[in-house]
Amino acid sequence: MKTSLAIVAILAAALLAFAHGSQRSQPEHVVLVSEDEPGQTLIVRGTVYAPDGETPVAGVRLTIHNADSMGYYCMLPSPERDRTLPRDNCPDSPPNTARIRGSLTTDAQGRFEFHTIKPGAYPNRRNPAHIHFQASGAGYSSQWPPDLNFAGDPFIPAADVERQAQLGKFRFICDPQPIGRGKAVHCDYNIRLEKK
């Protein structure tokens, strides 16, 4: 009887540890927005790969930035904000500086995760809503992987939509999926680095 209880206790502890993620380290993550940022919470997870598309790359520095839910980079949310203002009208920061930004380093398995809001498209322009990435380090020169776009955006060129199937795990158009019963969504986005 004691042996059976010991085995059950060991199995329960192993299952509990696995459920809490202790069997596999968690990727470094960064939160780009405060809890009161207007918009839909978006969690992006992915892995950075070497040019072969198979080997994860540890130690890559990712710099990420995106517009707010209304498509502006720099202006703070305001109900009085006029959407006809130039998108780079940033009174408290240098021009073209994104307010929603951050950086992180990929873990030993090349993984990363960040929390932001789903960006809006630029006002008065025909660009799809997107998130920018810059990758550097780990022996690679600084490079700009494809922007992450969102399925259903009418401004994504038809050719980009058509070629997604060919890209496999390196698709750059994601279809955000709900997380539990809340309003948050998540996307997977993998990056293939260019040659050194």
Q: Across the structure, where does each feature detected by a protein language model lie?
A:
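Positively charged n-region of N-terminal signal peptides that target proteins for export
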Residues: M1-L5
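Bacterial N-terminal signal peptides
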Residues: A6-L15
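Beta-strand-dominated extracellular/periplasmic modules and repeats
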Residues: H20-K196
